[in-house]
Amino acid sequence: MRVKEIQRNYQHLWKWSLIILGMIMICKAIEKSWVTVYYGVPVWKDAETTLFCASDAKAYEKESHNVWATHACVPSDPSPQELVLGNVTENFNMWKNKMVEQMHEDIISLWDQSLKPCVKLTFLCVTLNCIDVKNSTNNNTEEATITNCSFKVPTELKDKTETVHTLFYKLDVVPLNVTNNSSISSTYRLINCNTSTITQACPKVSFEPIPIHYCAPAGFAILKCNDKKFNGTGPCKNVSTVQCTHGIRPVVSTQLLLNGSLSEEEVIIRSENITNNAKTIIVQLNETVKINCTRPGSDKKIRQSIRIGPGKVFYAKGGITGQAHCNITDGEWRNTLQQVAIALRRQFNNKSIIFNSSSGGDIEITTHTFNCGGEFFYCNTSELFTGIWNGTWDKNCTSTESNCTGNITLPCRIKQVVRTWQGVGQAMYAPPIEGTIRCSSNITGLLLTRDGGNGKCNSK
């Protein structure tokens, strides 16, 4: 989408031009010529303007998107209008889009405002004495990913401290000295303490996205490309104008795109430069794939409260839960991956398409990262991105085959200390959530990278 501004070459005639334009649109509505008048007089040009947001946010909700949108956005239009521009061709470039940049800035603002009143956890940047808690052969719990740590915290009396014990995920701590036997107590620190200020997310605050509409101010309109096979750059011959976009959920995830919009026809491949393997490939699916994720609860209390001085509480992990995981129907996923391979093969001159898991990097890149019910999941997707397509699929699946009616289970790990992707030097501590957590999403797209050789694609 692009924002266009009406060019004001004759400022003293502007009021009259609006009145005349309105009259022409009313009087000529049944004729075809009015489109030319609307689009050509006055002249439209590219413009950089600040859009405003609209939403159906509920003031009584404590969810962060609702809180932010209640103050930052206007109510959404119950009957939005769209005007098709006949015989109009416009150039679009989704990779250089001011509206997308503004959306990013708004999400940064949302997270910043959500964390401002919350407790800074500078006291956690101390030496942690930790020992593994794995003492059983039960693989259905998260014991192997947990360490039990003791450290000193401030009390109500400024000159006194006390020692407390709590559980941390191993992904959240870094050893200061490595020992050969992992069961022996060792010293650690929190993973982001050397680079970031850590803020604890306020209790009873969640991050479940709601649809946000972006709207053009008076004198501007948003141009929308309606070509069903548009690849993101170049001319678009099916153009319309809208005052506001459709509702966009600001979902933050990696590798798999969740709860987005679908292609109306075939799978669409988009890249700023498909021949440059450093550029991300965005795949828009034409059918959703359901992904169901669970973190089982526990009989024991999962969250414990630790006082860290006057009026401040640190919500620590106090119990072990079941192993977090996600399920995807095998047959649905294989059929989807086949359609993606066919679309990719058209881009790469019918070369064989080989799917592999991520080739390395930060955990946010090597796993499918997303928020599920307030916990941050990091799921291993190596079972998803595997297979070769060279005109035939080496892993054919239909719903009637016995080995494809089951689920692909993705083991997931959880982090509580999360780097806020929108800012440098900032990290968030997500307090543990009590009870069983479940979330169900629709996979509507993929993020892929291509290696430097053939048609080999890695998840990103």
Curated annotation (Swiss-Prot):
Segments of this protein annotated with the region V1: 130-148
Secretion signal span: 1-31
GO biological process: clathrin-dependent endocytosis of virus by host cell; fusion of virus membrane with host endosome membrane; virion attachment to host cell
Protein name: Truncated surface protein
Main localization (coarse): virion
UniProt keyword terms in alphabetical order: AIDS, Clathrin-mediated endocytosis of virus by host, Disulfide bond, Fusion of virus membrane with host endosomal membrane, Fusion of virus membrane with host membrane, Glycoprotein, Host-virus interaction, Membrane, Signal, Viral attachment to host cell, Viral penetration into host cytoplasm, Virion, Virus endocytosis by host, Virus entry into host cell
Spans annotated as CD4-binding loop: 358-368
GO cellular component entries: membrane; viral envelope; virion membrane
InterPro entries for the chain: Gp120_core_sf, HIV1_Gp120
Note in the entry: Though this sequence contains a complete Env coding region, insertion of an extra nucleotide creates a stop codon prior to the normal termination; the authors suggest that this variation can account for the lack of infectivity of this clone.
Gene this protein is translated from: env
Intrachain disulfide bonds: 53-73, 118-202, 125-193, 130-149, 215-244, 225-236, 293-326, 372-439, 379-412, 397-404
Region feature (V2): 149-193
Stretches the record annotates as V3: 293-325
Domain of life: Viruses
Glycosylation sites: 87, 135, 139, 148, 177, 180-181, 194, 231, 238, 259, 273, 286, 292, 327, 350, 356, 380, 390, 396, 403, 407, 442
Chain segments carrying region V4: 379-412
Organism: Human immunodeficiency virus type 1 group M subtype U (isolate Z3)
Database matches in Gene3D superfamilies: Human immunodeficiency virus 1, Gp160, envelope glycoprotein (2.170.40.20)
Location of the protein in the cell: Virion membrane
Taxonomic lineage: Viruses, Riboviria, Pararnavirae, Artverviricota, Revtraviricetes
